[in-house]
């Protein structure tokens, strides 16, 4: 009998419900206003990477037995392993080992399946260059010890930031 009255009440309930939802969203927004910013000034400040971070691959030439397991488990067949069979001792002698980080997807399969643990992931992630051919690392470049971000005093990490008085 009074469809207009019920529609008006329904409209009023919808208005109240919409105002409540807007209020809930606004309170969430205001609760985040008290938090400190997460942004860092990248070249001058760096975050400390986690233990399981997959950065540049470190290679130990003396441990490698040239078994080519890393090549077989790599989804893109990336590591290039050159070896020569020594007939007198019946073992492979590693001549060259290289990885092109311009193609590498940093999946970590080579590190995980290496039987001699000659490969390991480091925390280095700054591999950018102006020439893509510089990203092809041979065994000498891969054997370079990783520089820890924490030990670098020219870079302010989150642990080394000066305390601010609030």
Curated annotation (Swiss-Prot):
Its cofactor is [4Fe-4S] cluster. GO terms for molecular function: 4 iron, 4 sulfur cluster binding; iron ion binding; NADH dehydrogenase (ubiquinone) activity; quinone binding. [4Fe-4S] cluster 1 binds at residues 64, 67, 70, 114. Its EC number is 7.1.1.-. It is a peripheral membrane protein. [4Fe-4S] cluster 2 binds at residues 74, 104, 107, 110. Binds 2 [4Fe-4S] clusters per subunit. It is an enzyme of class 7 (translocase). Pfam families: Fer4. One of its GO terms (cellular component) is chloroplast thylakoid membrane. Residues 55-84, 95-124 form the 4Fe-4S ferredoxin-type domain. NDH shuttles electrons from NAD(P)H:plastoquinone, via FMN and iron-sulfur (Fe-S) centers, to quinones in the photosynthetic chain and possibly in a chloroplast respiratory chain. The immediate electron acceptor for the enzyme in this species is believed to be plastoquinone. Couples the redox reaction to proton translocation, and thus conserves the redox energy in a proton gradient. HAMAP family: NDH1_NuoI. This is NAD(P)H-quinone oxidoreductase subunit I, chloroplastic. It comes from Acanthospermum australe (Paraguayan starburr). The gene is ndhI.
